[in-house]
Amino acid sequence: MTDFPIFESDAWRLTDQERKLTDQARELGETRFADRAARYDRDAEFPIENYRDLHSAGLLGICIPTEYGGLGANLRAYALAAAEIGRYCGATALTWNMHVCSCLWSGALADDLEMDGVVRKRHHDTRAVHYRRILDDGAIYAQPFSEGGSAA
């Protein structure tokens, strides 16, 4: 495994946040995820230890808005960090993507949907509860898109 960034800061014109997040993801990958990856794949095991590390690093809340206590990263910053994680543990990168997409669906993407005031308030209240669970307790979310009959 290489220990240099796949996204060279100057060539990619990374923002400070993008640089910090990719560095953080690479550090976790090198020091924690890489050694566990083969076991997770061989044993078809969920990478729970890696999720504990992601939670400790604040990365479970990468796309949770800052006003809720998250890192408030945009999609590009998230994608760059995910690519770094994928270099070290595919299972973690794949499942983390599902988790982050759940945050995006309930966050910025949902904000663009038409909702009446009552529904929007209920959505915001519910989303705040889920964000707190992620940030405080390390809750992991995903959506059932690949299961038969689950999507419209």
Residue ranges of model-derived segments:
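N-terminal capping segment at the start of a domain
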Residues: 28-38
